[in-house]
Amino acid sequence: MQQIPDHNALAAIGQHPNEAMPKLRVRGLRAATALAFLASTGLARAGEAEQPAFEFYGQLNFGIFHVDDGQGNDTYLSDNDNSNSRIGIIHQTELANGHRLKFHFESGLGFSGSAAATLDDNDLGLKWRRTELRKLEVVYSTPTYGRLSFGQGSTATDGVAETDFSGTGVVHYSSINALAGSAEFHTVSGAGSGTTINAAFRNFDGARRFRLRYDSAPYNGFGLAISAGEEVLRHGDDRDYYDLALRYDRDLDQFKVSGRIGYAWAGSDRSTVASSIAVFHKATGLNLAFATGRQQDTGADYAYLKLGLKRRWIDMGETAVSFDLFKGDDLAGIGSQSKSYGLGIVQKWDRYDTELYAGYRNYELKGASVAVADIDVAVIGARWKF
């Protein structure tokens, strides 16, 4: 996964963000929060550990977006949902024998995001909702037996479709719907088709949920992750979620290589498989990423390919450029074809911990009941990390 992607890729499951969460789940989340923090402080004292350390971090990431759906267009300022603005706190304690205990909180700031913007509703606003919560977990790590995580956070398959060395993930990666996911395709007569970019372009990557997760210690570059959990931030989803993933990471003399594959079960009627691989050539900066996924119950699938070049041409910082292609079948319904291509450039400004970026993407949908026009999206923006 793009590491800070919002990913942002979770689909709403029938609840308005301001509706009350079921009391049982609210209490469960609060109890987990208290347990996590007490564990991270209490066990530290019991284990004769070093003094615990706090780390505060965050980012602001805004872009100017121009969207043209073939019938109208608009330009607006929005939070970039490829990697939304956020803040986080880590409380970490080193225990004996290399063991480590960590409490991790992370939340979006609540700015209106690019994935929710439409041509009719795209004003930049600020309204925090509980769905902004990204991480609220306690993590216990050991050098030999791996890592155990409990609370709101990444499931085992989060990131399996998003392995990427390009350095352009802030402007485009395999979750290509994040730039303008709520934009609707229109017919040549100007009528809305009822199909949005979100519906026609998905990468089947995993999500963040309230879960128990185990990650094995790496062995010759390989690692295994498994998780079980449920959705507690959105009302109306009572399914149990189970995820299993295999990862591979190697840093070789000339190349860096990463691969991911994962299988996710959502209740008894839906399962998805997704995978990705990325290669980076150190001497030239050339890089490649490939991802694919399939929803087992519907047969919907896709393939994604990205080519990039990352070099330090100027003293300001590293420059990354990339081009990608996406092709999906049956994502918007049986017989539909979703195609997209995109360009991106990111310039790092090391002195100010900032990335300046620009990108363009074309979305094409064929095979629907009626012909629809392409949607074009362009963006320029900046991400500042602190």
Residue ranges and their predicted role:
Residues 62-68, 107-111, 154-156, 228-232, ...:
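Transmembrane beta-strands of outer-membrane beta-barrel pores
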Residues 88-90, 137-140, 213-215, 245-247, ...:
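Outer-membrane beta-barrel architecture
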Residues 75-85, 131-134, 206-210, 238-242, ...:
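Residues that define the transmembrane beta-barrel architecture of outer-membrane proteins
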Residues 2-5, 9-14, 244, 374-386:
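Outer-membrane beta-barrel "beta-signal"
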Residues 241-343, 348:
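Detector for outer-membrane/organellar transmembrane beta-barrel domains
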Residues 45-54, 94-101, 144-145, 220-221, ...:
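Short loop/turn motifs that connect adjacent beta-strands in outer-membrane beta-barrel proteins
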Residues 54-62, 101-105, 148, 222-226, ...:
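Transmembrane beta-strands of outer-membrane beta-barrel proteins
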Residues 48-66, 76-231, 238-240, 248:
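Outer membrane beta-barrel
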